[in-house]
């Protein structure tokens, strides 16, 4: 055998050795297969890929359905869409329209109840005025030209206190429901001290005026009945 033939024979043998064959997984011992950190990594990767594909498909389907349902936005001169103002994750204009459409029966009912309450209050005040007028007119005049009232001290005190408490409670209730957050902001004089510390307010003119209205009403009724 010549040198050239021996070189060709060695090259062909080398090519046969490096020819790729079917890849086989190397065998591991029972210890490495059972207790190693890499056990089932291939299966887990395939499962994660499948979950990721499912999530992508779901998100794409949901996005396409939302774009079909969403109305077309108006466009400006350069062709870009005009996006509505978004505050705190919501669109205030759209949310306001929806809430107004849902709450108009409640608003109408509240207005009707307020009107009925005002009519009832006016009726009660008219009756109270008639009673006070009659009691004020019923005075006795004796022979010495001294006027003597029919009402005693305790009766006069009870009537005046009742009128004052009624006026005070009405003004207090109106101020309470007209506040930003009833009972907390602004706090009432009867609210706990921690509410006053949280809001930073310890004095509210509305509740003070309610108390003042009650005092003035009590004094007015007492003066009229004397």
Swiss-Prot record:
It is found in: Nucleus inner membrane. Coiled coil: none annotated. The keyword Phosphoprotein applies. GO terms for cellular component: nuclear inner membrane. Residues 1-49 are annotated as: Disordered. Residues 38-48 have a biased composition (Acidic residues). The modification Phosphoserine is found at residues 2, 36, 60, 65, 80. The chain crosses the membrane at residues 111-131, 150-170, 205-225. Keywords: Membrane, Nucleus, Phosphoprotein, Transmembrane, Transmembrane helix. InterPro entries: ARL6IP6. It comes from the Eukaryota. It is a multi-pass membrane protein. The keyword S-adenosyl-L-methionine does not apply. Belongs to the ARL6IP6 family. PANTHER family: ADP-RIBOSYLATION FACTOR-LIKE PROTEIN 6-INTERACTING PROTEIN 6. This is ADP-ribosylation factor-like protein 6-interacting protein 6. It comes from Mus musculus.
